[in-house]
Amino acid sequence: MSGDLSRCLGKGSCPPGPVPEGVIRIYSMRFCPYSHRARLVLKAKGIRHEVININLKSKPDWYYTKHPFGQIPVLENSQCQLVYESVIACEYLDDVYPGRKLFPYDPYERARQKMLLELFCKVPPLSKECLIALRCGRDCTDLKVALRQELCNMEEILEYQNTTFFGGDCISMIDYLVWPWFERLDVYGLADCVNHTPMLRLWIASMKQDPAVCALHTDKSVFLGFLNLYFQNNPCAFDFGLCNPIIR
């Protein structure tokens, strides 16, 4: 079964075979924050799965039969049913598979987590814009001010709730949905954006103790190697750090 560290499939590759019974497949990419969301949920719930990594700079033609725009992540089950868009995919996994529910059962609490996610919605694009500006040698002062403000808004939520996690006293879906961008702050050169948010820093430290987060952590040197190649438009970026394909 292909694992998280399997090499990417690119243009000219053969499509994978049918998804085995009792397994769900995720089309992913090791460094993608949106795929990271779904991989965290798969890991947290202990769902048996296989990973097919996709080369996003040289996408296989067959992949457009999985997603009309060739985006990731996509889930596929043994009935050939496809689920895409990261939040939808995560909710599907939580609804379909047994184990601890990551979204609350209570309708209001579930709605509240989705509202928190809406408050977070500016962080991903701002993080990306800051990264691009820094990599291209452009001034990103205004972008970082805007990002800090959004992170201060998240800080205020934790202060108001007086809880360690965004969903309460234990990790829940909202924490996994926002985590990928916080894991990337240091790699992107944006770690100072949480210098004045003590509750957020406590949350980050607590998240780093979670087994699913630990299992999917990518070493900073590997991430930086990926970014260096990615910004050179090198299609080998997506396999950076893999000496040989790893099958598990």
Swiss-Prot record:
Binding site for glutathione: 59, 72, 85-86
Enzyme Commission (EC) number: 2.5.1.18, 1.8.5.1, 1.20.4.2
GO CC terms, sorted: cytoplasm
GO biological-process terms attached to the record: cellular response to arsenic-containing substance; L-ascorbic acid metabolic process; xenobiotic metabolic process
List of catalytic residues: 32 (nucleophile)
GO function term, MF aspect, one: glutathione dehydrogenase (ascorbate) activity
Reactions catalysed according to its record: RX + glutathione = an S-substituted glutathione + a halide anion + H(+); L-dehydroascorbate + 2 glutathione = glutathione disulfide + L-ascorbate; methylarsonate + 2 glutathione + H(+) = methylarsonous acid + glutathione disulfide + H2O
Short name of any one Pfam family annotated for the protein: GST_N_2
Keywords linked to the UniProt accession: Oxidoreductase, Transferase
Gene3D superfamilies: 1.20.1050.10, Glutaredoxin
Keyword Transferase carried by entry: yes
Residues annotated as domain GST C-terminal: 106-231
Membership in a protein family: Belongs to the GST superfamily. Omega family.
Name of the protein described by the UniProt record: Glutathione S-transferase omega-2
Organism: Mus musculus
